[in-house]
Amino acid sequence: MQLPRELKYAAIAGGVALFGLIFGWVLFPTILKSQLKKEMALSKKTDVRKMWEKIPFALDFKVYIFYFTNAEEVQKGATPILKEIGPYHFDEWKEKVEVEDHEEDDTITYKKRDVFYFNPEMSAPGLTGEEIVVIPHIFMLGMALTVARDKPAMLNMIGKAMNGIFDDPPDIFLRVKVLDILFRGMIINCARTEFAPKATCTALKKEGVSGLVLEPNNQFRFSIFGTRNNTIDPHVITVKRGITNVMDVGQVVAVDGKTEQTIWRDTCNEFQGTDGTVFPPFVPETERIESFSTDLCRTFKPWYQKKTSYRGIKTNRYIANIGDFANDPELNCYCSKPDTCPPKGLMDLAPCMKAPMYVSLPHFLDSDPALLTKVKGLNPDVTQHGIEIDYEPITGTPMVAKQRIQFNIQLLKTDKLDLFKDLSGDIVPLFWIDEGLSLNKTFVNMLKHQLFIPKRVVGVLRWWMVSFGSLGAVIGIVFHFRDHIMRLAVSGDTKVSKVIPEVEEQKDISVIGQAQEPAKVNI
């Protein structure tokens, strides 16, 4: 039996509407999700894997240094007056080396290598890196703080060692060129033959102090970041590839072959989160994104703040802070003991980096207000000093990331060392870094063309197919049954009643109105 032409058109239009409904709301999201699962995994053939192994553009690495303008007074116990100098801008290139895949457990191992190049054009106007700054002597203070904490009975010997190693310093401050203290290094004189300096230098060499490089003739060179520059990090990191389960992509499962740390207490020793360079897709804003920092030996869990956009792509902004270890049960295990936590907003780096320093947000943002009363010259601002990530939730791509961390040290006060007896004992800032990532136009456009433009086209097309298909089906049905509809309109069961005007009873004209005789008037 052949369908009438109008019903054929209606069937075709209805099919278009049904296809638009099924494809637009069922098939396409399923296909997209399946494709993303393949693309976001760290398999060898994906673009994500290539970018994960070697980021094809430089990150912004900015350093701000606090100049102690009243060092002589601080030596006598006065409140430090600080002047922030910066940024000193460095181009940071990141790559993963010695990469090995392990099919049996869907993991991948690697080591890190970072390379820094000073960029004077992107630094603050006039800064060359040759400026001389006055800051607390990080190495000298570090030695004193470590001995005071671990072997206080040896403080007297350390005092003699300092006089030999640092040539009888007049105070605990360092006057040094910026690039020397950051990368090039400053000489630590270990050529002295006296017992105290020699014994101390032998211990330094044995311990392998962070930032220290052995030079010829028993000299050491110390810098903050120099040992990281163009050097392969010794730690072997193991993460999930996400081929078996894409939601596990980038998850840290071991460092140096160990599946947990031994430096904290309880759950703080667990590896939670990704390595910070890749995140799983399809994360709802109600969930936190987690990343494990091998530099700080801890997990950060940024939380959702608000909707944002970057170069036309919708993103979710997540923010983070250091935390309040004393009052947050989840973070209390980062304290050496439950009741010996640092002030809010500070984290002790000694267990992780072997360095007696504290990290915080810059300018003590979101920290114990008492910290701001110990120094002058700080102005915390959430827009300039906060940690934030603009995260594309479908692919899990960080579009913009700003990791800002400040390094602080305690001005140790002790009567056993002449240079330290009048110090305040307060925690003061040394410098802070702003490590930033912003996807450039090339990679944003690539993301748009591979994902968002097809998604928008399908979004428009599905509504067009459903709307016009439904309309076409209705019109076809109406045209097919139009004659029948018209007949129903005119014949049907409805009867037409004949209206017969009512005939009124004839009346004589006299009945209509009786003549009235005029009233007689007597004159």
Curated annotation (Swiss-Prot):
Membrane topology (Cytoplasmic): 1-11, 480-523
Membrane topology annotation: Multi-pass membrane protein
Ranges facing Extracellular side: 33-458
Keywords (A to Z) from UniProt: Cell membrane, Disulfide bond, Glycoprotein, Membrane, Olfaction, Receptor, Sensory transduction, Transmembrane, Transmembrane helix
Localization per record: Cell membrane
Matching Pfam families: CD36
Keyword Membrane: yes
PANTHER family attached to this UniProt entry: SCAVENGER RECEPTOR CLASS B TYPE-1 SR-B1, SENSORY NEURON MEMBRANE PROTEIN 1
Biological role stated in the UniProt entry: Plays an olfactory role that is not restricted to pheromone sensitivity.
UniProt name for this protein: Sensory neuron membrane protein 1
